[in-house]
Amino acid sequence: DPLWSRGLGDVYKRQDEGRVIDAGDTPVQFDLQARSGQRWRVGLSVCYDLRFPELYRAHARAGADLLLVPSAFTHTTGQAHWEVLLRARAVENLAYVLAPAQGGVHANGRHTWGHSMLVDPWGSILAQRDQGAGVVAGELDVQRLSAVRAQLPALTHRVL
């Protein structure tokens, strides 16, 4: 469930998820075991949740290594904010971010941004798909995650 679910007026025009989806009240994580046996703690979010950094900090506090952000940003907001928000969430929470994103012009005329992306905890884009059907794939490296967290231990220095 998205933690935020209200009408967005002119931003999404005819879209009002709040009519059909109830907002959640608790961040959700789960453990995913890779074929290698490595366990990854995954923090869940949906689309507009990306604009609320406190959700991702809650995931980080719960030990998230990977933040999952499936989305359908509009073309306008996606072009302006998508990449910078994803990279910021990765850096400020020292976690990988995987963001599958719907893109293209839809039957109702809605134009979504696309640009599915995998970002590492340093904020580097590891893989990206601009528009159209396709797959974004990349490797999650636990050694890279540990190295970045050791190099920049900001989560242990936080004020609040």
Regions found by a protein language model. Give the residues of each.
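CN hydrolase (nitrilase-like) catalytic-core segments centered on the catalytic cysteine
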Residues: 50-136
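Active-site catalytic loop in hydrolytic enzyme cores
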Residues: 6-62, 75-84, 88, 149-154
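Short, well-ordered junction/capping motifs at the entry into regular secondary structure
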Residues: 1-2
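A short C-terminal boundary segment appended to hydrolase-like catalytic domains
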Residues: 143-160
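Short loop segments at secondary-structure junctions
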Residues: 33-35, 121-123, 140-143
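Glycine-centered loop/turn positions within well-structured domains
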Residues: 9, 124, 146
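Short, well-ordered beta-strand micro-motif
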Residues: 29-31, 118, 137-139
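A signal for specific C-terminal beta-sheet/loop modules enriched in small/flexible residues
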Residues: 14-16, 138-143
